């Protein structure tokens, strides 16, 4: 039995759990604990000698380090870097002076630190509590020390220890660290900062402050029965020896932290979480040599805060800080997430993800805590709406930040990284939609309450408008300018449009006096940033009042949606406003529903000045959303009515409906948190933010349709031309299709074009569903030929060839006024049909005649040209192809390219059928027949010279077509029955030249389109093919017989003719049923033309 080897002075076998070192002299192994060598010291030893070898070989030698300036205690030149945490670094840090933290740290007694205090003053700066009285903090007695920690936590507990000098982490057992702590000879500086003891017996001795319990997301909103356990980040024990240093960092997840010093003292170096500082921190932390750079030297100010025994320090989210322990210290700490600074928490979390930091104090499942908080916020919003109360602004803002983070986490490309932290039984898309809806409702309710408070204060200042113009309000007073601007907007709207107020608004205000409004307009100056597309140059813009109001409202929260139409148009009476606000709260959901239904029509029909103004509002998020829209709307209407010389209608209902429609649609200025939704259903927003790409004008037919219902214009062609000029742009960013929400426009097209009602809506919808691309004289030219070919290809696949015709006809009639379209169509026909017959030319001439008649009718009618206009006439007799005979349909279905000048109607009867495998192409068969006939004739002539036997008469002069067809059928039979003859290698030389194949294809296409062609016509076509193939065949048999055959063609198939009597053996081998005679074989070939459609 083999003995187990033993090692070391203790003579014990090898133990994998114990550190061992080899002696370089005797080559024996020794336990580190037996010879007094620590595992962390072993890398610094160059040559090790055991205690026995030290007597003969001397002591162990250490490695010669070239970077002792980083860690050594001696003085070094200034040009060399110093390692953070080294003895030299600590000495330099102690000697430095920093700004006092009294400027940024608030001293608050524990009894005053409540949730109300936090919400009122915010939690953006550190808070120092001198004593723990009233704080609700529970900690052990001051006699509690490190040995007690080992007793209550357990000596075998593995802890993460930081080597301060090297700024590296390692693991030790707690008992080993305690032994190091109490040792008198500390060779290294070790630091324990993340001993989380919430699941140990020591947890009963420590309780976080009450304010932490009330604010913490994990403590309040994380379910106890959740599948993922709560993160254990609330109770940490810090055991730090003298000169322990923790470099600058941001707590994981942007969490806030609390520190209580039980024994000793700690120094905090604090840096504000400004944007510049966070960017500098991210750059510094990502550098490879960041441990040799002191981060405080890169920022403008770093504050020094000393926390002594018995004091508690609260550090807000995002603060960058480092800690130094001047004396041995025992402290307790904890981290928590809260709703007072959600944005900073998210930013710090994103920085942490980008840097991929592996902090010792990680905040596990940070995203899960955010999901639970989002669910809680949704319930809080619903409860506040039921009770009629409003949530605090920081909660609304936090909900926005969280909802934006939820959307980014649930995107398709990012879901794989974040789905692990998604709570079980959660529906993230539904939560995002509901939360966005509640945020929007809460914002709308808060905006309707604001005018109530400010209405009385603003009524006095509205009376004297001239004084306001001379002495504009101070930027500090934000409320009066808002109210004043609302009333001035009312004045300008009513004065410019000259229409009564909508009847549905209760208690409409008295129209203002004209002199004041005129003064305001005449004295206006172009100051501040204005919209270029809002009005024409002849119409004045906003005056100094707008500039001062913009400046005054910059400090206010920019409203995402200017949703105060009723309070804007009502008198500043508190009771009236209160009643209206109550009505608004009840009608919020109905308004959102009506808005989602009317969004499509309004987006496609409102004036361009409104579209441009809304684009600037979305991009710049200006606080004057509603008022800008109101001014732009009035100016645009004034310009529109003046340019067309139309008298405004006297009925108040038109402008009332129009104005309410305008307000309902202009109020929502969408942001990333908004959804257009009903009470329970999600409405997809088809209108993303428009980009400024196209021409500034747009379709104004929405306004014209409403006016046409009440008055008839004096000159209808003038009105149509004006509308035609205004409709000269299409949004390049997105293509909008609207067929069923514009009955008025469709009716107008029907009335003016004079076509039948049957089928016009189908053609309108077909043309718009395909693309509805409109090209007018003032707009851009049509797409390139390659783009048009691609469009036509897609249309042909969908059997919708009408749209291309509309597209070409529209551009042609607009540009050439009748002449260029015919040339364009002729050019297209000429390019595509070079090899067609006379029948196609006759049809083309007929189409061009019809086109000229149609263009003449088009110019006489001066039709309304927009996306709904259908240029082709609808009186064609091909509207009902079902009742046409089969022969008539076959007659007009030549295999010709699509002509853009043809009349638009339903598709021709025969449609493209899918390619079937195993079918033979007729053109190849024809070429094979011609080649086989030629081969047969050559062999017959050879046999005629050799033997004087009896044979069939040759069709030299008398009947060339009949004999050629017979010989062609004979050759085709021999070629087609051989498998090799159907391959491309054999068929291509058989046709002799490409011209022969193309000619055969064109001839076959003409003959194949007739319904029941007789055999004579086909035999003659085969003969014609041979005589006209490539110009190499003569008109006689002798000329063809002298032609040599192409190399490699039919070499394996050269056999005598099937009609020869000397070929009986071969004839018996190849005979099949129905293929015995030449007539039967010819009939088989002709069945291809009889039943199939020839596709080239």
UniProtKB/Swiss-Prot annotation:
<feature type="binding site">
    <location>
        <position position="323"/>
    </location>
    <ligand>
        <name>2-oxoglutarate</name>
    </ligand>
</feature>
<feature type="compositionally biased region" description="Polar residues">
    <location>
        <begin position="1054"/>
        <end position="1065"/>
    </location>
</feature>
<feature type="compositionally biased region" description="Low complexity">
    <location>
        <begin position="954"/>
        <end position="1010"/>
    </location>
</feature>
<dbReference type="GO" id="GO:0035575">
    <property type="term" value="F:histone H4K20 demethylase activity"/>
</dbReference>
<feature type="compositionally biased region" description="Polar residues">
    <location>
        <begin position="1031"/>
        <end position="1040"/>
    </location>
</feature>
<feature type="binding site">
    <location>
        <position position="193"/>
    </location>
    <ligand>
        <name>2-oxoglutarate</name>
    </ligand>
</feature>
<feature type="domain" description="JmjC">
    <location>
        <begin position="197"/>
        <end position="353"/>
    </location>
</feature>
<keyword id="KW-0156">Chromatin regulator</keyword>
<keyword id="KW-0597">Phosphoprotein</keyword>
<feature type="region of interest" description="Disordered">
    <location>
        <begin position="871"/>
        <end position="1080"/>
    </location>
</feature>
<feature type="modified residue" description="Phosphotyrosine">
    <location>
        <position position="724"/>
    </location>
</feature>
<dbReference type="GO" id="GO:0032454">
    <property type="term" value="F:histone H3K9 demethylase activity"/>
</dbReference>
<comment type="function">
    <text>Lysine demethylase that demethylates both histones and non-histone proteins. Enzymatically inactive by itself, and becomes active following phosphorylation by PKA: forms a complex with ARID5B and mediates demethylation of methylated ARID5B. Demethylation of ARID5B leads to target the PHF2-ARID5B complex to target promoters, where PHF2 mediates demethylation of dimethylated 'Lys-9' of histone H3 (H3K9me2), followed by transcription activation of target genes. The PHF2-ARID5B complex acts as a coactivator of HNF4A in liver.</text>
</comment>
<feature type="compositionally biased region" description="Basic and acidic residues">
    <location>
        <begin position="575"/>
        <end position="630"/>
    </location>
</feature>
<feature type="region of interest" description="Disordered">
    <location>
        <begin position="719"/>
        <end position="755"/>
    </location>
</feature>
<feature type="binding site">
    <location>
        <position position="266"/>
    </location>
    <ligand>
        <name>2-oxoglutarate</name>
    </ligand>
</feature>
<keyword id="KW-0137">Centromere</keyword>
<dbReference type="InterPro" id="IPR019787">
    <property type="entry name" value="Znf_PHD-finger"/>
</dbReference>
<feature type="binding site">
    <location>
        <position position="259"/>
    </location>
    <ligand>
        <name>2-oxoglutarate</name>
    </ligand>
</feature>
<dbReference type="GO" id="GO:0005730">
    <property type="term" value="C:nucleolus"/>
</dbReference>
<keyword id="KW-0832">Ubl conjugation</keyword>
<feature type="binding site">
    <location>
        <position position="321"/>
    </location>
    <ligand>
        <name>Fe cation</name>
    </ligand>
</feature>
<dbReference type="InterPro" id="IPR003347">
    <property type="entry name" value="JmjC_dom"/>
</dbReference>
<feature type="binding site">
    <location>
        <position position="246"/>
    </location>
    <ligand>
        <name>2-oxoglutarate</name>
    </ligand>
</feature>
<dbReference type="GO" id="GO:0045815">
    <property type="term" value="P:transcription initiation-coupled chromatin remodeling"/>
</dbReference>
<protein>
    <recommendedName>
        <fullName>Lysine-specific demethylase PHF2</fullName>
        <ecNumber>1.14.11.-</ecNumber>
    </recommendedName>
</protein>
<keyword id="KW-0223">Dioxygenase</keyword>
<feature type="compositionally biased region" description="Pro residues">
    <location>
        <begin position="503"/>
        <end position="515"/>
    </location>
</feature>
<feature type="modified residue" description="Phosphoserine; by PKA">
    <location>
        <position position="1057"/>
    </location>
</feature>
<feature type="compositionally biased region" description="Basic and acidic residues">
    <location>
        <begin position="545"/>
        <end position="560"/>
    </location>
</feature>
<feature type="region of interest" description="Disordered">
    <location>
        <begin position="448"/>
        <end position="630"/>
    </location>
</feature>
<feature type="modified residue" description="Phosphoserine">
    <location>
        <position position="734"/>
    </location>
</feature>
<feature type="modified residue" description="N6-acetyllysine">
    <location>
        <position position="716"/>
    </location>
</feature>
<keyword id="KW-0158">Chromosome</keyword>
<feature type="modified residue" description="Phosphoserine">
    <location>
        <position position="726"/>
    </location>
</feature>
<keyword id="KW-0804">Transcription</keyword>
<dbReference type="Pfam" id="PF17811">
    <property type="entry name" value="JHD"/>
</dbReference>
<keyword id="KW-0560">Oxidoreductase</keyword>
<keyword id="KW-0479">Metal-binding</keyword>
<dbReference type="GO" id="GO:0005506">
    <property type="term" value="F:iron ion binding"/>
</dbReference>
<dbReference type="GO" id="GO:0006482">
    <property type="term" value="P:protein demethylation"/>
</dbReference>
<feature type="modified residue" description="Phosphoserine">
    <location>
        <position position="651"/>
    </location>
</feature>
């Amino acid at each position: 039995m083999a003995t187990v080897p033993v090692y070391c002075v203790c003579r014990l076998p090898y133990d994998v759990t114990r550190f061992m070192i080899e002696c370089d002299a005797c080559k024996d192994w020794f336990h580190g604990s037996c010879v007094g060598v620590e595992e962390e010291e072993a890398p610094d030893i160059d040559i090790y000698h055991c205690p026995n070898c030290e007597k003969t070989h001397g002591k162990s030698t250490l490695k010669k380090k070239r970077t002792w300036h980083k860690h050594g205690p001696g003085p070094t030149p200034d040009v060399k870097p110093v390692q953070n945490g080294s003895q030299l670094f600590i000495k330099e840090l102690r000697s430095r002076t920093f700004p006092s933290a009294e400027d940024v740290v608030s001293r608050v007694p524990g009894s005053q630190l409540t949730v109300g205090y936090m919400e009122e003053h915010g939690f953006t700066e550190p808070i120092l509590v001198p004593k723990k009285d009233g704080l609700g903090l529970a900690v052990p007695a001051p006699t509690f020390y490190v040995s007690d920690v080992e007793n209550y936590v357990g000596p075998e507990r593995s802890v993460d220890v930081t080597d301060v000098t090297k700024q590296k982490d390692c693991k030790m057992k707690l008992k080993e660290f305690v032994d190091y702590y109490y040792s008198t000879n500390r060779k290294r500086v070790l630091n324990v900062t993340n001993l989380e003891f919430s699941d140990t017996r020591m947890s009963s001795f420590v309780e976080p402050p009450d304010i932490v319990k009330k604010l913490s997301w994990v403590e309040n909103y994380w379910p106890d029965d959740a599948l993922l356990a709560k993160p254990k980040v609330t109770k940490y024990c810090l055991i730090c020896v003298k000169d322990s240093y923790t470099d600058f960092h941001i707590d994981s997840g942007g969490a806030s932290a609390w520190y209580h010093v039980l024994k000793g003292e700690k120094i905090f170096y604090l840096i504000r979480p400004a944007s510049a500082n966070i960017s500098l921190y991210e750059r510094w932390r990502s550098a490879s040599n960041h441990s040799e750079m002191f981060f405080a030297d890169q920022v403008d100010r770093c504050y020094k805060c000393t926390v002594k025994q018995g004091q508690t320090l609260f550090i807000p989210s995002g603060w960058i800080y480092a800690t130094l322990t001047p004396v041995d210290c025992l402290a307790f700490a904890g981290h928590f997430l809260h709703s007072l600074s959600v944005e900073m928490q998210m930013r710090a979390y994103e920085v942490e993800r980008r840097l991929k930091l592996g902090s010792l104090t990680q905040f596990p499942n940070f995203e899960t805590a955010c999901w639970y908080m989002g669910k809680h916020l949704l319930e809080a919003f619903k409860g506040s709406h039921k009770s009629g109360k409003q949530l605090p602004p920081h909660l609304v803002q936090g909900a926005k930040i969280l909802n934006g983070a939820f959307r980014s986490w649930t995107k398709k490309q990012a879901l794989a990284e974040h789905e692990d932290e998604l709570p079980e039984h959660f529906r993230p898309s539904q939560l995002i939609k509901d939360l966005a809806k509640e945020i929007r409702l809460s914002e709308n309710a808060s905006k309707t309450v604001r005018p109530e408070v400010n209405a009385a204060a603003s009524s006095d200042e509205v009376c004297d408008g001239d004084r306001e113009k001379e002495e504009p309000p101070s930027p500090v007073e934000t409320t009066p300018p808002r109210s004043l601007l609302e009333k001035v907007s009312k004045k300008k709207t009513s004065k410019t449009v000259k229409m009564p107020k909508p009847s549905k608004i209760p208690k409409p205000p008295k129209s203002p006096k004209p002199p004041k409004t005129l003064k305001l307009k005449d004295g206006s100056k172009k100051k501040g940033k204005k919209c270029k597309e809002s009005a024409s140059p002849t119409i004045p813009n906003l005056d100094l009042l707008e500039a001062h109001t913009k400046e005054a409202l910059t400090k206010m929260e920019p409203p995402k949606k200017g949703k105060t139409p009723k309070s804007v148009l009502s008198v500043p009476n508190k009771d009236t406003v209160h009643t209206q606000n109550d009505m608004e709260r009840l009608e919020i959901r109905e308004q959102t529903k009506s808005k989602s239904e009317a969004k499509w029509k309004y987006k496609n029909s409102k004036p361009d000045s409104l579209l441009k103004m809304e684009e600037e509002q979305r991009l710049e998020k200006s606080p004057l959303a509603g008022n800008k829209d109101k001014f732009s709307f009035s100016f645009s209407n004034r310009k529109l009515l003046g340019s067309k010389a139309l008298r405004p209608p006297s009925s108040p209902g038109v402008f009332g409906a129009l104005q309410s429609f305008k307000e309902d649609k202009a109020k929502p200025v969408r942001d990333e948190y908004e959804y257009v939704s009903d009470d329970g259903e999600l409405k997809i927003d088809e209108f993303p933010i428009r980009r400024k790409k196209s021409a500034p004008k747009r379709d104004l037919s929405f306004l014209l349709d409403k006016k046409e219902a009440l008055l008839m214009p004096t000159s209808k062609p003038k009105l149509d031309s004006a509308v035609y000029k205004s409709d000269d742009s299409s949004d390049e960013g997105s293509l909008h299709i609207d067929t069923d929400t514009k009955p008025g426009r469709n009716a107008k097209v029907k009335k003016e074009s004079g076509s039948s009602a049957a089928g016009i809506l189908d053609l309108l919808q077909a043309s718009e569903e395909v693309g509805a691309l409109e090209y007018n004289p003032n707009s851009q030219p049509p797409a390139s030929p390659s783009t048009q070919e691609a469009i036509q290809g897609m249309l042909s696949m969908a059997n919708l060839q009408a749209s291309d015709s509309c597209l070409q006809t529209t551009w042609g009639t607009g540009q050439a006024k009748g002449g260029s379209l015919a040339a364009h169509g002729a050019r297209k026909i000429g390019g595509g049909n070079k090899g067609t017959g006379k029948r196609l030319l006759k049809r083309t001439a007929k189409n061009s005649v019809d086109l000229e008649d149609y263009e003449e009718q088009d110019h006489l009618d001066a039709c309304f040209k927009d996306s709904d206009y259908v240029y082709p006439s609808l009186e064609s007799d091909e509207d009902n192809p079902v009742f046409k005979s089969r022969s008539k349909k076959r007659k007009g279905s030549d295999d010709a390219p699509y002509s853009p000048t043809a009349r638009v109607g339903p598709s021709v009867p025969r449609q493209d059928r899918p390619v079937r495998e195993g079918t033979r192409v007729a053109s190849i068969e024809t070429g094979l027949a011609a080649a086989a006939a030629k081969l047969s004739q050559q062999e017959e002539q050879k046999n005629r010279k050799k033997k004087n036997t009896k044979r069939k008469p040759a069709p030299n002069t008398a009947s060339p077509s009949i004999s050629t067809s017979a010989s062609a059928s004979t050759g085709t039979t021999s070629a087609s029955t051989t498998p090799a003859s159907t391959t491309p290698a054999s068929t291509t030389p058989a046709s002799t030249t490409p011209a022969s194949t193309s000619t055969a294809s064109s001839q076959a296409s003409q003959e194949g389109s007739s319904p029941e062609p007789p055999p004579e016509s086909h035999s003659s076509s085969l003969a014609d093919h041979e005589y006209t193939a490539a110009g190499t065949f003569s008109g006689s048999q002798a000329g063809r017989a002298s032609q040599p055959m192409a190399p490699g063609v039919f070499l394996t198939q050269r056999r005598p003719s099937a009609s020869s009597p000397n070929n009986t053996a071969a004839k018996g081998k190849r005979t099949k049923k129905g293929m015995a005679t030449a007539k039967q074989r010819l009939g088989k070939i002709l069945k291809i033309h009889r039943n199939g459609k020839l596709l080239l």
